Structures are given as C-alpha cells and as structure tokens.
UniProtKB/Swiss-Prot annotation:
Its EC number is 2.8.1.10. One of its GO terms (molecular function) is thiazole synthase activity. This is Thiazole synthase. GO terms for cellular component: cytoplasm. Pathway: Cofactor biosynthesis; thiamine diphosphate biosynthesis. Belongs to the ThiG family. Pfam families: ThiG (PF05690). Transmembrane segments: none annotated.
Length: 256
C-alpha cells in the first residue's frame, strides 16, 4: 500500500497518457498495468468539456487523475496551468513540470522550487518532476511537496536509471514518497528502481510506443510487483568469493 498525502494506492506503478495510437488502446494499457494514478497533460485536453477524447475514457476507467503542467517554461506558467486544472477537474493534485528546453526536456530546478512553494501555499498537493539532485529534492520536501519525482534519464529516452547513484541518496534521505519518473524504458528498469527503495515509478513512453502496449503494461505491472517483493524477502548479501550451493566433497568421502 502506497500513501501520498490524502490518498492510498495498491499499485506502485503510475502511468501517463501520451503517445498512444488511440484512446481505446490507452485505456486498455492502463487497465492492464493496474495503475491507479494517471498523469494527464493539460495542453492535450479540452478542459471545457468532459467528453474530451482523452479525458472521458479516463474518467470512465475510474483512475485518479494527476494533471501535469508539461509545456510550462516558467513558474508563472505552471501556476496558471495548475489553477486551470483545479477548476476544470476539481482536484488539488498536480504533477509540476517546468522544462524550458524542448530538446532535452530537463526540469528547471529554480523555477520548479519557486512554483512548488507557491502552489503548496495555495492548497495544491504537489508532486514535482525534478532532476536527480538530492539537495533539490530535500528542498522540495521542505516546502511541502507530497512526493518528489526525480528523473532516471531524460523524458522518453528509455535509457533506464542513468542517475542511479543520486537516486539512492534521494531515496535514503527522503521522508516523502520517491517516484522515479522519466527514462524508464523496460520493465527491468522499473524493478531496479523499486529494489533500490523507490516508492513508485511513472512510465509512459515505454508502454505507449511498444509494439504491444497492453502486454508491455502487464510486463511493467509484474516487474513492479517483483521489485517490491524482492527487498521484502531479504535477498542474500553480495560476496567477492564463490560459495558452493551444495557440498563439494561429501559424495567422494561417502564412496571411500
């Protein structure tokens, strides 16, 4: 069970809604993933009506929506988008994204911290997408963010946990949930993140662009379950030397 702010989730896999070939395929994949929290870019939906091609099936699926501010380049733009989302969707939950460079989509740490502090004061439950910077993540936690979402690698790159060393520090020092976001390309990456101690992962591109998004979503669901179960089971310690799993000489001595 994962608790963030006032909500609890059985699934530790969060999913996105971008890049799917159709809304129907998107919903089928989300259901197959078991995800209960789904991000939604405000720039991609018509907030004036709930029969939007993306929004309507998500509402029907009964998932918790996490609107994001993707496309915002400044704190001011992100705050504006946040208020639009709250008014249209009736939720205080927000994934805060501010990335001024469209080529790399790396989060702006200064603008993110600035926006996060303001939005928390305005009553939002803020989950900021940020770089894998332990100092920044601690600052975001201190201003009241409900979780932190450090990147594993650039958005959509499928590179995996390129920031592993920094993620380990973030996880070790955090007192709020850590959700590894961006760069997760295959299910094993998700399992590794959970084995490291992350509380959840957010996956979009790896599922949406797969040849079979529904089966890939299932694979991620199973990987996340494995990643959670493994550390709970007390894995053996690593050793420099080999250790036999069965006696090496007993059968020889018995035959003499």
């Amino acid at each position: 069970m994962l608790r963030i702010a006032d909500k609890t989730f059985d699934s530790h896999l969060f999913t996105g809604t971008g890049k799917f070939a159709s809304s129907q395929l998107m919903v089928e994949a989300i259901r197959a993933s078991g995800s209960q929290l789904v991000t939604l870019a405000m720039k991609r939906v018509d907030l004036r009506q709930h029969n939007d091609a993306i929004l309507e099936p998500l509402i029907a699926a009964g998932v918790t929506l996490l609107p994001n501010t993707s496309g915002a380049k400044t704190a001011e733009e992100a705050i504006f988008a946040a208020h639009l989302a709250r008014e249209a969707l009736g939720t205080n939950w927000l994934k805060l994204e501010i990335h001024p460079d469209a080529r790399w989509l790396l989060p702006d740490p200064i603008e993110t911290l600035k926006a996060a502090e303001t939005l928390v004061q305005q009553g939002f439950v803020v989950l900021p997408y940020c770089g894998a910077d332990p100092v920044l993540c601690k600052r975001l936690e201190e201003v009241g963010c409900a979780a932190v979402m450090p990147l594993g690698a650039p958005i959509g790159s499928n590179q995996g946990l390129e920031t592993r060393a920094m993620l380990e520090i973030i996880i070790q020092q955090a007192t709020v949930p850590v959700v590894v976001d961006a760069g997760i390309g295959v299910p094993s990456h998700a399992a590794q993140a959970l084995e490291m101690g992350a509380d959840a992962v957010l996956v979009n591109t790896a599922i949406a662009v797969a040849d079979d998004p529904v089966n890939m979503a299932k694979a991620f669901r199973l990987a996340v379950e494995a990643g959670l179960l493994a550390p709970q089971s007390g894995p053996g310690s690593r050793s420099y030397f080999a250790h036999a799993t069965s006696p090496l000489t007993g059968f020889l001595e018995a035959s003499v």
